[in-house]
């Protein structure tokens, strides 16, 4: 499992979830932390190095 905090200004959580679920065939979940930030979690990803590279674009 990998969890990061991302700003709503950077990317919509629904768009990011769709992109990651299609690319890595895994499950995602997100929840609002405050009005500007959400917590995004990824479960069941086998290629964590590539996932971290992708998430680094948004953090």
What are these regions (language model features)?
Residues 19, 29-31, 40:
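Generic structural signal for short, flexible, solvent-exposed coil/loop and linker residues
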Residues 24, 34-36:
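Intrinsically disordered, low-complexity segments enriched in polar/charged small residues
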């Amino acid at each position: 499992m990998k969890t990061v905090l991302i700003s709503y200004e950077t990317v919509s959580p629904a768009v990011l979830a769709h992109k990651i679920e299609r690319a890595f065939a895994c499950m995602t979940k997100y929840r609002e932390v405050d009005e500007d930030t959400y917590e995004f979690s990824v479960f069941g990803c086998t290629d964590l190095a590539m996932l971290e590279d992708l998430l680094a674009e948004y953090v």
